[in-house]
């Protein structure tokens, strides 16, 4: 099989992957795996300013289910919105009460996992980044809102991203786009910002012609093509770009910068790179949420305690319907290594959506692990005129 509509392939990356991933030739060459890879080399100048060179392998707009990777743009949009509102006493640590004004909505007034005992945008984002919490994503999406999300994404240049679903499964179809009243309260329980029940005003079209993937069982031996046009849409290229902008926002020209404060950026980076065991609020049981819980790159399916303190993976992952996605900024402070890497692979041999029978551990995660190490090994050997100063990132994890 040949790839269709996949024009973006770098000869250099093609050669590197085929030379280093000889055990995964099928995943690289067979279109049924829908493999995409985006790798960014980073070269610093004498003032530590970065320059980027992107290499792509089979990068396309073809539909892939982004799963939990949408938590990155949802979190980013929430922080941008808070800063734009610029209301007194309103910030990510302000108590956020979610009300209920529609049949599938839930009133949320407490959060035992937060330091204050109350829900906050900050604690929800921590839970998304640390353990990929779907309920936290739903609450933050409700604050952001369908219309604001797509208007702001369009302003930022991400015209194709679609955030239609909240991931918690509570509100089906278009009802997911109807967001409940949200109240922010100060320490005296006075309302500092109130957002009413909000209906979406525009039904957005899906940006690609076909979003059908696999088949859906509808009866005994009866299947239909699975249409994802009502689901979230986020290409690996756009995801990679968002991660790059967050990591390097302070280094970008003014016209390319995200409208995000550096303090909010550093907050995002800290929890993208943190292990669950390092978090105090929220706190996680180490046996359940092990170090490599959401670190597909470098660690694959291993249930590992990470001892390589010099390496940090700032990342977001997705896993559903046979799709595996990881998007990361990977650094090694000891060896002065840094690079950006995003990849998706589809490991659903029967091509049946919702079967629960996927080759994550047998094929997908080992591939992502090997892929990331092949890039790491290449970066370790690659000569650079100036070594990067990565102190800004290492200091995020100092006590």
What are these regions (language model features)?
Residues 37-39, 96-98, 153, 163, ...:
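Generic structural hydrophobic/aromatic packing signal, biased to beta-strands
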Residues 5, 35, 41, 185-186, ...:
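Intrinsically disordered, low-complexity regions enriched in small/polar residues
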Residues 6-25, 29, 217, 221-399:
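Structured C-terminal helix/loop/strand segments within mature extracytoplasmic catalytic/sensor domains
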Residues 117, 131-257, 263-264:
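Mid-domain, small-residue-enriched loop/turn segments at the edges of structured enzyme/sensor domains
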Residues 50-55, 92-96, 107, 193-200, ...:
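Short low-complexity stretches enriched in small and charged residues
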Residues 61-66, 81-82, 122-123, 155, ...:
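Glycine-rich loops and low-complexity Gly/Arg-rich segments
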Residues 3-178:
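Active-site-adjacent loops and short helices of periplasmic peptidoglycan-processing enzymes
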Residues 54-67, 71, 192-194, 318-331:
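Generic detector of contiguous secondary-structure segments
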């Amino acid at each position: 099989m040949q790839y269709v509509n996949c024009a973006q392939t770098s000869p250099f990356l093609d050669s590197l992957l085929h030379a280093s991933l000889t055990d995964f030739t099928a995943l690289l060459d067979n279109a049924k795996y829908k493999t995409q890879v985006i790798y960014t080399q980073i070269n610093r100048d004498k003032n530590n300013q970065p320059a980027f060179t992107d290499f792509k392998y089979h990068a396309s707009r073809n539909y892939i289910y982004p799963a939990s990777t949408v938590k990155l743009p949802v979190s980013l949009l929430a922080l941008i919105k808070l800063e734009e509102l610029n209301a007194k006493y309103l910030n990510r640590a302000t108590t956020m009460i979610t009300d209920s004004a529609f049949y599938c909505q839930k009133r949320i007034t407490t959060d035992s996992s937060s330091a204050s005992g109350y829900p906050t945008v900050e604690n929800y984002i921590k839970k998304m980044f640390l353990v990929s919490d779907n309920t936290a994503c739903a609450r933050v999406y409700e604050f952001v809102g369908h219309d604001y999300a797509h208007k702001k994404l369009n302003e930022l240049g991400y015209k194709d991203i679609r955030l239609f679903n909240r991931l918690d499964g509570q509100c089906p179809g278009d009802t997911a786009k109807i967001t409940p009243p949200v109240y922010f309260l100060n320490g005296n329980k006075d309302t500092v910002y109130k957002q009413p029940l909000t209906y979406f005003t525009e039904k957005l079209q899906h940006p690609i012609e076909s979003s059908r993937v696999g088949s859906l069982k509808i009866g005994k031996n009866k299947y239909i093509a699975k249409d994802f046009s009502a689901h979230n849409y986020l290409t690996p290229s756009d995801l990679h770009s968002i991660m790059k902008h967050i990591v390097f926002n302070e280094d970008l020209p003014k016209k390319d910068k995200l409208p995000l404060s550096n303090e909010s950026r550093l907050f995002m980076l800290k929890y993208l790179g943190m292990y669950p065991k390092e978090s105090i609020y929220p706190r996680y049981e180490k046996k359940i949420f092990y170090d490599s819980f959401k670190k597909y790159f470098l660690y694959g399916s291993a249930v590992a305690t990470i001892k390589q303190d010099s390496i940090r993976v700032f990342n977001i992952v997705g896993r559903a319907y046979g799709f595996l996605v990881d998007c990361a900024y990977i650094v090694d402070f000891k060896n002065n290594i840094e690079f950006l890497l995003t990849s998706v692979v589809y490991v659903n041999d029967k091509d049946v959506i919702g079967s629960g029978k996927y080759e994550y551990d047998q094929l997908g995660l080992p591939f992502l692990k090997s892929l990331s190490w092949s890039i790491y090994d290449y970066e370790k050997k690659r000569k650079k005129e100036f070594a990067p100063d990565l102190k800004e990132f290492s200091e995020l994890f100092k006590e």
